[in-house]
A protein has these predicted regions:
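Ferredoxin-reductase
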Residues: 1-61
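Gly/Ser/Thr-enriched, mixed-charge loops and adjacent short helices
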Residues: 53-162
Length: 162
């Protein structure tokens, strides 16, 4: 629900939304950087306490946005943004010819997996690897990467509820 609400808001404001779906925060950071996106947005719901989850904003360099920016975004969402001696209006909706589009960006996730595989200094050929994905965001990346590095990979807890 959060994913599609965010997509609706972005596209209604004239922006395109590239979806990686369930994935890891490092993959969003990597794709934001290498594919030259203005930013990356990660909706997180992890093993962390609830107050550490929510929306993570990543800049075009693949880094977490500075705290000052995050606070401005939070104030804007709360309707309390007052900067440069003025209140900021709601984001305008795009005109029909400028509505953004949603792109299922599996290519991005695959590129990230290729990057991880390219880092493989060691061969895992003949090595048995057990992965507990904890039903989390790495479930659709981890096995593919270890398999590509030659491991005999066994995975448990790779059924996240999304």
């Amino acid at each position: 629900m959060f994913e599609y609400s965010l997509i609706a808001g972005l596209t209604a404001s004239g922006e395109d939304a590239y979806l990686l779906h369930v994935t890891t925060t490092p993959s969003v950071a990597y794709i934001a950087r290498v594919d030259d996106f203005d930013c990356g947005i990660m909706i997180s719901a992890s093993h962390n306490p609830y107050y550490d989850n929510g929306i993570k904003l990543i800049d075009c360099y693949g880094e977490k946005m500075p705290e000052e920016i995050l606070l401005l975004v939070e104030d804007y969402i709360d309707g309390k943004l007052h900067v440069f001696d003025k209140d900021w209006p709601e984001l305008p909706f795009a005109h029909r010819e400028h509505i953004g589009c949603m792109v299922d960006y599996v290519t991005g996730r695959n590129r990230y997996m290729g990057y991880l595989i390219s880092l493989g200094i060691y061969s895992f050929k003949g090595v048995k690897v057990g992965l507990d994905c904890a039903n989390g965001s790495s479930w659709n990346i981890a096995k593919s990467v270890f398999d590509a590095l030659g491991a005999d990979t066994y995975v448990i807890n790779a059924q996240p509820t999304v």
